[in-house]
Every structure is written in C-alpha cells, then in structure tokens.
Amino acid sequence: MKLSHLAAALSAQLVAPVAAGYLRQDILTAGTLRDTTVPAAPNEDLNQIVSDSQLLSLHRTICEIESVSNHESTVGEALIKYLGEHDFTTEKQIVPVDEDDDSTDERYNVWAYPKGSPKPKIILTSHIDTVPPHINYSLHAPEGDFDRANITIKGRGTVDAKASVAAMIIAALDHMKESPDVPVGLLFVVSEERGGTGMIHFSDSELNTSPPFFHTLIFGEPTELKLVDGHKGNLRFDVEAKGVSAHSGYPWLGHSAISEILPVLARIDGLGDIPVEDGGLPSSEKYGSTTLNIGTVRGGAAGNVVPESASASVAVRLADGTVEDAQDIIRKAVADASGGSKNITLKFPDDKAYPPIDLDTDVDGFELLTVNYGTDIPKLDIHDEDSDVKVKRYLYGPGTILVAHGVDEGLTVGDLEKAVEGYSKLIDAAVKRG
C-alpha cells in the first residue's frame, strides 16, 4: 500500500476487512499432476471411490467436521476414536481457548503413540483448526476423460491442514503394519491459525523433555509436495496516533490524528525496499526481501469531524536478522517520520515473534522450496543443546497455499495420495537415524 492509496483509504475512513487474529499467507505456485487418465463413465461414483479408500475416507471424515480455531473438540474426538481403533494409545492435552475468544469449547491437542511406546523418537505433527468460515466438503470430477487422481476435493481444511493430518496417519499406520514397534508418534494441535496456542502448550508441557526423547519432527503444511528448506520470520506491531477532535469547518481548533499517522505509515510501508544502511529492514539471498503488510487502518468518527484517534496494525515477514534488530529499525523509522511526536505510540504486543526459520532437507527425492508463510515450528522449543543427537525438523505436505484460506480451498486425490508416499519417505529416513 503506497502513500497515495493509503491517504485515499484513510480519508474515506475505511477499515480493511480481515478476520481477527489471522494473517493472510503468501502465494506459492501450483504443483503438477501425474497423467493417469483412463476412459470412464461420466456418472462415476465419487463418493464410493472415497469410501473405498482408507486415506480418502479418513480425510472426508475430519473435513466434514467444522473446526474453526477454538472450536476443535469435535474433530479431536473423531481422531481419538480413529486412532484408538488402530492400535494407538491416545492422550488429550487440554488447551484453554484463546483469551480474545468467547468459545466455551473444551478443546485439546491430540497426542498419540503406538501402544507401549510413550516416547517415540519420530513425531509427525500438524494442526486440526481452520480459519473461518467453514465450507462444506465436496467432490468434483475432472473435466474430460475420467482420471481418479484428478478428482478434486474442496472445502475448508481440505488443504490446510487436514490433508496433512490424514496423510500422516495413514503413513504411520502403513509403517506399523510392517513394523509394529516403529517409534512414531502423532501430535495434532489446536489454534495454529490463531498464533500457535496449541503448540506452545505442548512445548511448555512435560512431554517436551530436556533432552528430547525424540530426534525427528515432521511438520505438515501445504508445501506442494516439496520439502521446505526454511520460512521467513514473523513480527507484528501496532501504531497509534492521538489528536484533538473539532468541527471540520474549524480544523485549527483541533488536531488530526490521521494527519499524524499518515507519514509514519508511508515510511513503514517502504521499509522492505530500503537498504539496511539507509534505515530499511534486511533482505537475504535465501528469503529475498523483508515484506510488510499494513493490514488494518482505523481512524476518525465522521467526515465532518477532525479525528482524535487513528491506528494501524502491521505484519512483517522477516528475511534476515533478529526480531530485536527489526524492532529497533522500526522504532527509528517511526521516530524519524513523526519528528519524534509524542502523539505517536508504537507497540509490539506479540511475544510470539520469531526470526527466519531454517529447516532440514537431507532426505533425497524431494524438490526444495522456501516459503513466506508462518508455521508452528518456532513455537516448539527444542532442548537439545546438551544432547549428542540434534533434533531434525522437516516441513512437507500436500496442496498449495494458493488456495488455502480461500473459497476454493481444495486439492486432488492424486496430491493427497502422493503425500502418504512423501511422509513415508521421511519416516524411513528418520528410522535409519536410530
């Protein structure tokens, strides 16, 4: 948002329409599909195809259940039941609802492991919450000749991240059939979409031992079936401006908070394009430029009233450096743009900020990808400083961020089935570590 657009938006006193607590994720390119087309009747029974597949039917079951953040208990119960029926010991890790939500749902993380193996060395983890609104599960046949792999599954959570949840479970079960004592655990957390409350709760619990009993973590998010070598850091902050209200016919009797905040926001908006030596935020060869998004702007009471207050919320995707360094750069930029005005206040309310996250990619057979969106990975503190074996972290999953959170969220049967193969490959590599 450049200054001319920003000024127009502010003068019209508009507020960007965003769901509270959620950040829009960045776009990746779509993946490719294998060619397995065969002629088939146009009235192919899509529901029967799903019912005949353990993977697809599990995916359908959990996607048909609404599980917007802070309302995950029903899908949690479905997973507890399913895993218990398939030789897993399951535990509920109760997680209080987020402070800014009035939900009364008694939701929880799901922790599961093979019977008799409460400390698995390999953990597969993803999240069971979704962004709002819930969109019903639906199946769509491919155009032209029928190809089972190109059946499209749509609905909220079909990609982000219940596709990962279902594929992880089936991959784990496949390994347990071959080797009942395979040391694999499953962790499905709540509120990833609202700041990672579920993963933070697990991280702070007695299950997160020091040193860790696990040596491999496999995280599930939509990555187009590619192995992610890292993602940008995350930082949020708010800017507030104070003014004095007055009749717009006599503006000299007041002081416009919007006029105070405009130059500050203009400066903030360009920090990702300014070299560090000139006061901008850092870039890197791996992650590109640091990006900023002025997500909400609020101010004023009416067009004929000098506004006494204005505010903006900003999300930053860090490409390099530390959170503390970025905060210092932002503080100086705001002070310079405002001339040190006492009417401008800068707040960093998010104690969940983190720098760029580098991940492991030492398993052959995957294309690599770097992403801009955030995950639960930095929310899990790993206490391996004094351990001879360092914990490896992988990020992989079916589907693309291109459609996650949107009205057309969905993926193909082929992508979902390939994800089981991908997770199995990662499990195999982890088993070889011992």
UniProtKB/Swiss-Prot annotation:
<feature type="active site" description="Proton acceptor">
    <location>
        <position position="192"/>
    </location>
</feature>
<keyword id="KW-0964">Secreted</keyword>
<dbReference type="GO" id="GO:0046872">
    <property type="term" value="F:metal ion binding"/>
</dbReference>
<feature type="binding site">
    <location>
        <position position="160"/>
    </location>
    <ligand>
        <name>Zn(2+) 2</name>
    </ligand>
</feature>
<dbReference type="InterPro" id="IPR002933">
    <property type="entry name" value="Peptidase_M20"/>
</dbReference>
<feature type="binding site">
    <location>
        <position position="193"/>
    </location>
    <ligand>
        <name>Zn(2+) 1</name>
    </ligand>
</feature>
<feature type="signal peptide">
    <location>
        <begin position="1"/>
        <end position="20"/>
    </location>
</feature>
<keyword id="KW-0645">Protease</keyword>
<keyword id="KW-0732">Signal</keyword>
<dbReference type="InterPro" id="IPR011650">
    <property type="entry name" value="Peptidase_M20_dimer"/>
</dbReference>
<dbReference type="Pfam" id="PF07687">
    <property type="entry name" value="M20_dimer"/>
</dbReference>
<feature type="glycosylation site" description="N-linked (GlcNAc...) asparagine">
    <location>
        <position position="136"/>
    </location>
</feature>
<protein>
    <recommendedName>
        <fullName>Probable carboxypeptidase BDCG_03757</fullName>
        <ecNumber>3.4.17.-</ecNumber>
    </recommendedName>
</protein>
<dbReference type="GO" id="GO:0008233">
    <property type="term" value="F:peptidase activity"/>
</dbReference>
<feature type="binding site">
    <location>
        <position position="160"/>
    </location>
    <ligand>
        <name>Zn(2+) 1</name>
    </ligand>
</feature>
<keyword id="KW-0378">Hydrolase</keyword>
<feature type="glycosylation site" description="N-linked (GlcNAc...) asparagine">
    <location>
        <position position="150"/>
    </location>
</feature>
<keyword id="KW-0325">Glycoprotein</keyword>
<dbReference type="Pfam" id="PF01546">
    <property type="entry name" value="Peptidase_M20"/>
</dbReference>
<dbReference type="InterPro" id="IPR050072">
    <property type="entry name" value="Peptidase_M20A"/>
</dbReference>
<keyword id="KW-0862">Zinc</keyword>
<comment type="similarity">
    <text>Belongs to the peptidase M20A family.</text>
</comment>
<dbReference type="GO" id="GO:0006508">
    <property type="term" value="P:proteolysis"/>
</dbReference>
<dbReference type="GO" id="GO:0005576">
    <property type="term" value="C:extracellular region"/>
</dbReference>
<keyword id="KW-0479">Metal-binding</keyword>
<feature type="glycosylation site" description="N-linked (GlcNAc...) asparagine">
    <location>
        <position position="343"/>
    </location>
</feature>
<dbReference type="InterPro" id="IPR036264">
    <property type="entry name" value="Bact_exopeptidase_dim_dom"/>
</dbReference>
